[in-house]
């Protein structure tokens, strides 16, 4: 049985990760750290402990003090340029907090780290956002977890709480393409619940050492891998 912790639990993918962890028979405990109280499935609330704080500078110490120590730490934490008030602040928040929390998890003894990244992550990219995503990946890999799992989804299909008109239009196209044939969508867009199931399944496999050959330390899942590991019953 795995003890787990999660940040980003109120976002589109993170909320699905939380519900999948709560429903999974191999998960004994779920701790979340967030600015808002997550909307979790009430049926499995006995597994769930929530820490809610607007002061993100306290999150790392909260994570360090968790008992028992989470064996798997999941991060679906992200923000936007608009909500952060510009890219410089977005970088400080998204890169800074992700790396700080990963370091705290490693120092506490967490064995497996699971990150929701992006298909476009590239340290040599022209645009700042994919460079930031790549830098988060590289910095958490350098921490030397027993195993690091990185998911690189394409467009994340599903309903967001906040308004992103351009992204919403593209999600509509993805949804229409998926209704015609899943193959028209799966290569460049994945449903949020599928990404979440893939993250949970891959994290648990990594904890057991059941990872593909050559991915013993770092396991990167692209779009087709996310579809593969996110398929099946919805917990």
UniProtKB/Swiss-Prot annotation:
Its main location: mitochondrion. It comes from the Eukaryota. SUPFAM superfamilies: NAD(P)-binding Rossmann-fold domains (SSF51735). Pfam families: Epimerase. GO terms for cellular component: mitochondrial outer membrane. It is found in: Mitochondrion outer membrane. It comes from Aspergillus oryzae (strain ATCC 42149 / RIB 40) (Yellow koji mold). PANTHER family: OXIDOREDUCTASE HTATIP2. InterPro entries: Epimerase_deHydtase, NAD(P)-bd_dom_sf. Residues 1-36 form a transit peptide. Signal peptide: none annotated. Belongs to the FMP52 family. This is Protein fmp52-1, mitochondrial. Disulfide bonds: none annotated. One of its GO terms (biological process) is import into nucleus. It is a peripheral membrane protein.
